[in-house]
């Protein structure tokens, strides 16, 4: 399929599956904005570029949360802590605008767009539902105000779309065991080409060392035994960097990845008291697809290279 064709197909797919009403949307050729309630959600496809010899289009998903947030060290610390519980999006501060938004992205290619569009759909749905549920409480915690905006023709949407209640479906699907089973996790150890120095697996868990610094590898972890506090079963993914924990670096990584990532951004950079500076995300059971865990391993490996180049450009 031609590049422009699959971009248009992905946007049509997301619009249809999210059941977006035309009257509450603004459509453009490679983007759309819609209002499920008072918070705008934007979906757009960035211009084409080449990455490792492959033509790539990045599909971004972003939902407004707060405006008027003071950009202080306290804000960085709160965001770095909040992002420890990320599912498929990051809380990202836009410093010049004093705004906090939810953001995620997927990398689209002619070979992967069918899988990528589906995980993008889940990121879009969870983002929209989380924004609806959390915005008022976050405004109080971070000192800003809810970034409610009107549709340019319809005005402010007073009655929320039924889709804002979609979290219940994810919660129900997460009541059972993870669909990422032991055989699937064990099989990842034998991936070729190998993206790591060394990898091992336990029941439902994978751990691998990735090149980062000469004697300090980064750590990739997948854990299908982990359960999300709200969504239940699925797959926890982590990328731990061998660096001192720093709230501002976590914000820098999230902000830069929201501009031009080299891999799927399905989660967030954060600071954890035990694990330090890391990227984390959670794939809920309802988002399971064959081949997804394999793709995530390679995207986490690419994310590691991207972070190393950003933080140590001369290295």
Language-model region placement:
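Generic alpha-helical secondary structure
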Residues: 3-7, 11, 72-76, 178, ...
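Hydrophobic-cavity lipid-handling domains and compact docking modules
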Residues: 28-30, 34-68, 204-240
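Short, internal acidic amphipathic alpha-helical interface segments
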Residues: 58-99, 229-280
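Beta-strand elements of well-folded, non-transmembrane domains
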Residues: 65-69, 106-110, 212, 241-243, ...
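Well-ordered alpha/beta subsegment
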Residues: 90-125, 136-140, 264-297, 309-313
């Amino acid at each position: 399929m031609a590049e422009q064709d699959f971009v248009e197909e992905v946007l049509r797919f997301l619009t249809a599956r999210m059941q977006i009403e035309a009257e509450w949307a603004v459509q453009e050729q490679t983007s759309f904005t819609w209002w499920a309630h008072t918070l705008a959600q934007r979906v757009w496809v960035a211009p084409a570029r080449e990455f490792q010899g492959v033509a790539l289009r990045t599909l971004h998903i972003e939902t407004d949360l707060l405006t008027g947030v003071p950009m202080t060290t306290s804000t960085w610390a709160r965001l770095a802590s909040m992002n420890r519980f990320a599912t498929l999006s990051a809380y990202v501060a836009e410093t010049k605008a004093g705004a906090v938004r939810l953001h995620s992205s997927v990398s689209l290619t002619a070979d992967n767009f069918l899988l990528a569009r589906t995980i993008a759909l889940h990121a879009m749905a969870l983002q929209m539902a989380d924004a609806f549920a959390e915005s008022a409480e976050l405004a109080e915690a971070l000192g800003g105000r809810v970034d409610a905006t009107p549709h340019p023709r319809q005005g402010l949407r007073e009655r929320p779309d039924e889709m804002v209640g979609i979290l219940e479906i994810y919660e129900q699907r997460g009541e059972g065991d993870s669909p990422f089973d032991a055989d699937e996790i064990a099989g990842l150890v034998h991936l070729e080409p190998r993206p790591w120095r060394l990898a091992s697996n336990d029941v439902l868990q994978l751990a691998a060392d990735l090149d980062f610094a000469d004697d300090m590898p980064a750590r990739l972890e997948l854990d299908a035994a982990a359960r999300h506090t709200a969504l239940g079963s699925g797959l926890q993914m982590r990328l731990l960097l061998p660096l001192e924990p720093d709230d501002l670096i976590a914000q820098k990584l999230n902000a830069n990845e929201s501009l031009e990532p080299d891999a799927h951004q399905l989660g967030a950079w954060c600071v954890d008291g035990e694990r330090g500076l890391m990227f984390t995300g959670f794939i809920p059971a309802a988002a399971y697809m064959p081949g997804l865990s394999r793709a995530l391993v390679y995207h986490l490996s690419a994310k590691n290279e991207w972070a190393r180049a950003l933080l140590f450009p001369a290295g």
